[in-house]
Each structure stands twice: as C-alpha cells, then as structure tokens.
Amino acid sequence: MNNLSFLASLLAYTITNPKIGRQILQAKYQSWQDSGYPVFNYAEKKLQLDDIIKALFPESSYLIEDLRKGTDKLQNHVDDFFNKLKNETYPSKKKPYPLEYTLDNKSGLFLYILCKIIKPEKVVETGVAYGLSSMYILQALSENKKGMLYSIDSVFSPWQSKEMIGSAIPSHLCENWRLVFGSSSEKLKET
C-alpha cells in the first residue's frame, strides 16, 4: 500500500469513525515525532537464558529444560496459526499486524518462566496484536492455577479489528484473560 492510498483510506476511515480516526492520526504523529530522536547504540552482552534466570532468581530450583517443555505445545500452536496467515497479505482484515510484531520463542519462554517463578496475581500488558506474549503468560498462569492477565489494546488502523486482537490465543487459555479495549493512556488508570 503506497503512501497516497494509505492516506486516502485513512481520511475516509476518519470521516466515518472520527474518534478512532483521531487516535490513529495521533499515533502516526507520535511515531513521526519519535523518528526525529536519536537512536542510541548500547553495548550488547549476550547471555544465555539459564544464566539470566539464575541471576534473577538464585533460589529457584526450576530447570530451564523442564520449563521449555511447558511451551512446546504453544510453539506448535503458533506455527499452525502463522501457517494459516502465510498466504494473506498485510495489511488486511485477515492479517492486520506485520509479522515483525511477533514474539520470538526465547522471549516467549522468558515471559513464561517469569510468570511460573513469580506466580503473579495480576499482569498488565499494553499492546496485544495477535497475542503471542499473552499466550506464554497465560500458559504459566493456567499452570499456576492463579493469576489474571489484563491486556490493553485498541484498533489503530482501518484494517484492524477488535476480533483479531489476541486471535492467536488458544481458547483454553482465555479463562485467565481480560481484554481491555481502548488506548493504554486512558485504560491503564482503570486497570
């Protein structure tokens, strides 16, 4: 989608949906402003997940390999979900988020492990997209038999829909999940 057709579709959408259209314009303006700030290069030190968990939780008796097994089914589910989307084009109603929005396996495993060890009663996440990070958190909460994930997200583009937010989350994990629909700046105060 070139810039001109994007702007035309955004203008048409804004006319019929002024509140959401205003939010989209504000988000695009904020993104444009952010692009003017310098990007800092930080030194990178690669650590293994085992080392990170041991540093954060030295008393923990969890073995990473055992915890990794708890996410194998999730990874298969993610693979199946994205296989169904591979022939869809972005942006569209069926593929509203770019694949760059996806979470890699190690980051998902890290979220899962954090929730398994900490056993939180409440988790708040801003931004859901397909729901990959939500899935890993929810898997841990389900296994912990406690905790609730509150995910805040909204529709920011004409091709996005409320139905696609968290669409990758398996239905059996939704018991511990509440989608709070709206902008984070407004809804964080309520959550």
Predicted features along the sequence, with ranges:
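Short, intrinsically disordered, charge-balanced linker/junction segments flanking boundaries
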Residues: 56-60, 64, 184-191
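Proteins with a high burden of low-complexity, intrinsically disordered sequence enriched in S/T/G/P/A and R
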Residues: 34, 46, 75, 79, ...
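Class I SAM-dependent transferase core
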Residues: 41, 52, 60-105, 113-118
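Membrane-proximal basic amphipathic "stem/tether" segments
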Residues: 1-61
